[in-house]
Amino acid sequence: MTNIRKMHPLMKIMNSSFIDLPAPSNISSWWNFGSLLGACLAIQIITGLFLAMHYTADTATAFSSVTHICRDVNQGWIIRYIHANGASMFFMCLFIHVGRGMYYGSFTLSETWNIGIILLFTVMATAFMGYVLPWGQMSFWGATVITNLLSAIPYIGTSLVEWIWGGFSVDKATLTRFFAFHFILPFIITALVMVHLLFLHETGSNNPLGTTSDSDKIPFHPYYTIKDLLGLLFLLLLLMMLVLFSPDLLGDPDNYTPANPLITPPHIKPEWYFLFAYAILRSIPNKLGGVLALIMSILILAILPLLQTTKQRSMVFRPFSQIMFWTLTADLFTLTWIGGQPVEYAFVIIGQIASILYFSLILIIMPTVSLIENNMLKW
């Protein structure tokens, strides 16, 4: 009798995706982050659902409903902090996942890569709207500043901003629709994740060498299920240490002050995971130029396959490309730091240099270095 997991229509899909899936025998721990992102998404949806049971999307009661969750709801404080810090874990895994794709040349799997970019934008939109919901000072002013960027679009900008706001300023209508979108988007993300996996399983995973793995595959279970489980334990350990020891480490103290349209905080800034893009936005004096640079800082990932000049897919045997990759990583850390600093002369200059370096590395320096390495292979 054939095993039920190979015969049952539903079990068959699960089996071919997570049990009998042929996987490369040499994929390293950098390949763990896909499953960790799935775990983060599950954690966020579950904790978010419980928070939504007690939250009220109304300007008069939103702030106090979050306070009520933390003070009066059974284990409400831990659910709230797991959700807030879970977002940070989500983005940490996302950035490593994208970095892994760049380093090992996974962007050559174009459908998977492009769905991944759409996922990145969707997750960023979801996180932004979630940050607005507690209706603290930084929530309100962050929403005002970021949505106002759309007014830079010629002709329709102002109308578009007022349409998104549902009025002439960020108010009750804005909060209500942001809550509605914040609730529905994670389910859209889940659907996109399924499409992402569908395309990945069409071609099979890349591996650290960047070579084809067809001749050497192993079953996903038990080898990679155990490996993913270990990664998940590390993730949960890190998340719970953050939640239980310093839950406000990555947050902003201004968000513990209820939103007040009459008082502007001294320094408006988004959460840490948006700071690199925020620094690029601020480094360009022109509003429209800044918005375009902001969008391009993420959208530039889509043209990576066109910029590939190397004969080797992975960077494992390309030391100069490795140096450029880690320079790019350091540059992103610099941009993140600058995004959190006030707009003062020294910080502005550093931000502008880091922004120019970011685009130069991806568009010019890395493809050029790859060409040089190609020529060195002939020696």
From Swiss-Prot:
<comment type="subunit">
    <text>The cytochrome bc1 complex contains 11 subunits: 3 respiratory subunits (MT-CYB, CYC1 and UQCRFS1), 2 core proteins (UQCRC1 and UQCRC2) and 6 low-molecular weight proteins (UQCRH/QCR6, UQCRB/QCR7, UQCRQ/QCR8, UQCR10/QCR9, UQCR11/QCR10 and a cleavage product of UQCRFS1). This cytochrome bc1 complex then forms a dimer.</text>
</comment>
<keyword id="KW-1133">Transmembrane helix</keyword>
<dbReference type="InterPro" id="IPR030689">
    <property type="entry name" value="Cytochrome_b"/>
</dbReference>
<dbReference type="GO" id="GO:0008121">
    <property type="term" value="F:ubiquinol-cytochrome-c reductase activity"/>
</dbReference>
<keyword id="KW-0999">Mitochondrion inner membrane</keyword>
<feature type="binding site" description="axial binding residue">
    <location>
        <position position="97"/>
    </location>
    <ligand>
        <name>heme b b566</name>
    </ligand>
</feature>
<feature type="binding site">
    <location>
        <position position="201"/>
    </location>
    <ligand>
        <name>a ubiquinone</name>
    </ligand>
</feature>
<dbReference type="InterPro" id="IPR036150">
    <property type="entry name" value="Cyt_b/b6_C_sf"/>
</dbReference>
<keyword id="KW-0812">Transmembrane</keyword>
<keyword id="KW-0813">Transport</keyword>
<dbReference type="GO" id="GO:0046872">
    <property type="term" value="F:metal ion binding"/>
</dbReference>
<feature type="binding site" description="axial binding residue">
    <location>
        <position position="196"/>
    </location>
    <ligand>
        <name>heme b b566</name>
    </ligand>
</feature>
<dbReference type="Pfam" id="PF00032">
    <property type="entry name" value="Cytochrom_B_C"/>
</dbReference>
<comment type="similarity">
    <text>Belongs to the cytochrome b family.</text>
</comment>
<keyword id="KW-0679">Respiratory chain</keyword>
<feature type="transmembrane region" description="Helical">
    <location>
        <begin position="320"/>
        <end position="340"/>
    </location>
</feature>
<dbReference type="GO" id="GO:0045275">
    <property type="term" value="C:respiratory chain complex III"/>
</dbReference>
<keyword id="KW-0496">Mitochondrion</keyword>
<keyword id="KW-0830">Ubiquinone</keyword>
<dbReference type="InterPro" id="IPR016174">
    <property type="entry name" value="Di-haem_cyt_TM"/>
</dbReference>
<dbReference type="InterPro" id="IPR048260">
    <property type="entry name" value="Cytochrome_b_C_euk/bac"/>
</dbReference>
<dbReference type="InterPro" id="IPR027387">
    <property type="entry name" value="Cytb/b6-like_sf"/>
</dbReference>
<feature type="transmembrane region" description="Helical">
    <location>
        <begin position="288"/>
        <end position="308"/>
    </location>
</feature>
<keyword id="KW-0479">Metal-binding</keyword>
<feature type="transmembrane region" description="Helical">
    <location>
        <begin position="77"/>
        <end position="98"/>
    </location>
</feature>
<dbReference type="InterPro" id="IPR048259">
    <property type="entry name" value="Cytochrome_b_N_euk/bac"/>
</dbReference>
<feature type="transmembrane region" description="Helical">
    <location>
        <begin position="33"/>
        <end position="53"/>
    </location>
</feature>
<feature type="transmembrane region" description="Helical">
    <location>
        <begin position="226"/>
        <end position="246"/>
    </location>
</feature>
<dbReference type="GO" id="GO:0006122">
    <property type="term" value="P:mitochondrial electron transport, ubiquinol to cytochrome c"/>
</dbReference>
<feature type="transmembrane region" description="Helical">
    <location>
        <begin position="178"/>
        <end position="198"/>
    </location>
</feature>
<dbReference type="InterPro" id="IPR005797">
    <property type="entry name" value="Cyt_b/b6_N"/>
</dbReference>
<feature type="transmembrane region" description="Helical">
    <location>
        <begin position="347"/>
        <end position="367"/>
    </location>
</feature>
<dbReference type="Pfam" id="PF00033">
    <property type="entry name" value="Cytochrome_B"/>
</dbReference>
<protein>
    <recommendedName>
        <fullName>Cytochrome b</fullName>
    </recommendedName>
</protein>
<dbReference type="InterPro" id="IPR005798">
    <property type="entry name" value="Cyt_b/b6_C"/>
</dbReference>
<feature type="transmembrane region" description="Helical">
    <location>
        <begin position="113"/>
        <end position="133"/>
    </location>
</feature>
<comment type="function">
    <text>Component of the ubiquinol-cytochrome c reductase complex (complex III or cytochrome b-c1 complex) that is part of the mitochondrial respiratory chain. The b-c1 complex mediates electron transfer from ubiquinol to cytochrome c. Contributes to the generation of a proton gradient across the mitochondrial membrane that is then used for ATP synthesis.</text>
</comment>
<feature type="binding site" description="axial binding residue">
    <location>
        <position position="182"/>
    </location>
    <ligand>
        <name>heme b b562</name>
    </ligand>
</feature>
<dbReference type="GO" id="GO:0005743">
    <property type="term" value="C:mitochondrial inner membrane"/>
</dbReference>
<keyword id="KW-0472">Membrane</keyword>
<feature type="binding site" description="axial binding residue">
    <location>
        <position position="83"/>
    </location>
    <ligand>
        <name>heme b b562</name>
    </ligand>
</feature>
<keyword id="KW-0408">Iron</keyword>
